[in-house]
Amino acid sequence: GSDLGPLLALTAQPDIISFAGGLPAPITFPLKELEEVAVKVRQEDGAGAMQYGPSLGFMGLRETIAARMNRMYVPMGMTEISAKNIMIVTGSQQGLDITGRVFLDKDDVVLIESPSYLGAIGAFALEQPKFVEVPTDGEGMIPEELEKLIQTTERVKFIYVIPNYQNPTGICWSLERRRKLMELATKYEIPVFEDNPYGDLRFEGEEIAPLISMDPKHLVMYSGTFSKTLAPGMRLAWMVCNDDILAKMDLVKGSTDLHTPSVT
């Protein structure tokens, strides 16, 4: 089972205030706005919201996400993305699970930060890969150590990182380390899973360019979520991938839950 399961079960106890589960404060949930939107959806297209939909997700939402990412990241160097390269997933945890199913066989290798996110390790572990930790300091993975491991490790399928407010350390990768990582990924043509659940939670300082804005070969699989900025109970997140990867992920997504609930 998931190592996060017991942590989340504890949070249901009324006398527990948990700092372990990554739960947003309920006071921040936009309940009134969500109620208004739910009424509007029911009035305008209630039947459509309750019907089966495409496995990649509702096109209107994908277009909105693409427009927002283009507005934020094209000025930082990202190649403009299209809605057709976005898949809506049932929480970013499903994106992790689908990525593991697409990329990993037993004894394949995932390069991870040291330490790394427990939920990602749990999702990938279902495919029985090997996890190789890359020495990491307060600025991110150490490039020399990463290249050394790339050169000496067989069957590396992808690199998994959380550049913004990393879980569990909380570090934010420096711009230079992000560039170095993408230079190495490009040089050795290794896919990179950029997990960005916390990027919108910056309280001070300038936003640092994401890895997807430094990706000339479209190797980055970008994961974003509404769990920290809207409400985790909606189980609403997305992934941005190149055409080939997204086609494979679409097959897996359709075979597991058909599609993320249209009503959300």
Annotate each PLM feature.
Residues 213-264:
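Conserved core segment of the aminotransferase class I/II
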